[in-house]
A protein has these predicted regions:
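Alpha-helical substrate-binding/gating segment
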Residues: 179-187, 195-230
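Mid/C-terminal beta-alpha module of Rossmann-like enzyme folds, strongest
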Residues: 215-262, 295, 300-302
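Conserved beta-loop-beta element that borders a ligand/cofactor-binding pocket
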Residues: 113, 147-170
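Glycine-rich "substrate-gating" loop/helix at the edge of Rossmann-like oxidoreductase active sites
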Residues: 133-137, 165-172, 192-202
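NAD(P)H-binding glycine-rich loop region in Rossmannoid oxidoreductase-like domains
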Residues: 36, 43-94
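Conserved Rossmann-fold NAD(P)-dependent oxidoreductase catalytic core, especially the SDR/UDP-sugar
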Residues: 93-135
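C-terminal amphipathic/interface module of NAD(P)-dependent oxidoreductases
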Residues: 265-302
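N-terminal Rossmann NAD(P)H-binding glycine-rich loop of SDR-like oxidoreductase domains
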Residues: 3-23
Length: 302
């Protein structure tokens, strides 16, 4: 297949690109820095620096939309929030415009989202049909991003939305950020530790995306989370045991709010999410339990 990917150099995107190339797909990556694409992935991919380089004659069977400015890396000033929104929603709007003009429409649009869509819901079990409980920045961002991507359906395109949990793998993402303080015995629970953390291993996320490509009956929203979410306290205990290190330095919620401001909601919000629709599809999770994800071979980066 001929596949266009935005966000192809990110933590998930670069592994997805490599996996699709191994299966013989032709991959085009949209990136503001095409040279970076070739350095990270190699010369097997075609690169674009701007969607304006596409014409109505370009034909992609699948578009996978993962692009977006990192949400956690910088203080959420009003200007930063606008950048985070624009790089997701404006780019998605541009993709919709391309799809509208395309002589041959893509068969499938897979577009990113996150479980932040649900807001802070305590112990409530959340499935794809669950309503959001709050309308904070993260929730509005996810809802607006999804609504924009859904516009592709009016042109006969099958749309799959991936509400992604906390993505784990040893070569990046949340786990890599947490490893260093835990290795030095400086890890600990965040807030009261009772907030639910719905996570997924990167290899399972990639398998979900590839299933969406092959299974033409799949459409709509899917929770990309492992079937066994854990509380922050359980996550901390399991990671500390895996590393054989103590976890003795809890981080109070008030201190997180001082240090991170509004971003602290990403660490303190509780989302107990289950992948109901994937389980209905009999999707096989390679890493259904947290310990299995933490102990995966370090060479397994795809």
């Amino acid at each position: 297949m001929n596949i266009l990917i935005t966000g192809g150099t990110g933590f998930i995107g670069r592994a997805l690109v490599k996996s699709l190339l191994k299966e013989g797909h032709k991959v085009t990556v949209l990136s503001r820095t095409p040279d970076t694409v070739n350095k990270i992935i190699g010369n097997e991919v075609t690169t674009l620096s701007n969607l304006n380089q596409l014409t109505s004659e370009h034909h992609f069977q699948v578009i996978i939309n993962l692009a977006g400015a990192p949400i956690f890396d910088h203080h959420w000033s009003d200007a930063r929030k606008q950048i985070i929104r624009d790089r997701r929603i404006q780019l998605t709007e541009q993709l919709i415009s391309y799809i509208k003009a395309a002589t041959v429409k893509p068969e499938l649009l897979i577009s990113g989202s996150a479980i932040g869509y649900y807001g802070n819901q305590g112990n409530k079990v959340l499935i794809e049909s669950s309503s959001p409980a709050s309308h904070d920045f993260s929730q509005r961002l996810c809802a607006d991003w999804e609504a924009t991507a859904q516009l592709a359906s009016q042109f006969g395109v099958r749309v799959c939305l991936i509400r992604t949990g906390l993505v784990l793998a040893h070569d990046g993402g949340l786990l890599q950020r947490m490893l260093l303080p835990f290795k030095f015995g400086l890890g600990g629970i965040l807030g009261d530790g009772q907030q639910w953390m719905s996570w997924i291993h990167k290899a399972d996320w990639i398998a979900i995306a590839k299933l969406m490509i092959s299974n033409t009956a799949m459409q709509g929203v899917y929770n990309a989370t492992a079937p066994h979410p854990v509380t922050n306290s359980e996550f901390t205990k399991t990671l500390a045991q895996h590393l054989r290190r103590p976890a003795l330095l809890p981080m109070p919620a008030w201190l997180l709010k001082i240090l991170l401001g509004e971003r602290s909601e990403l660490l303190l919000a509780s989302q107990r999410v289950l992948p109901e629709r994937l389980l209905t599809e009999n999707f096989h999770f390679q890493y259904p339990e947290l310990l299995s994800a933490l102990t995966e071979p370090r060479t397994n980066h795809e």
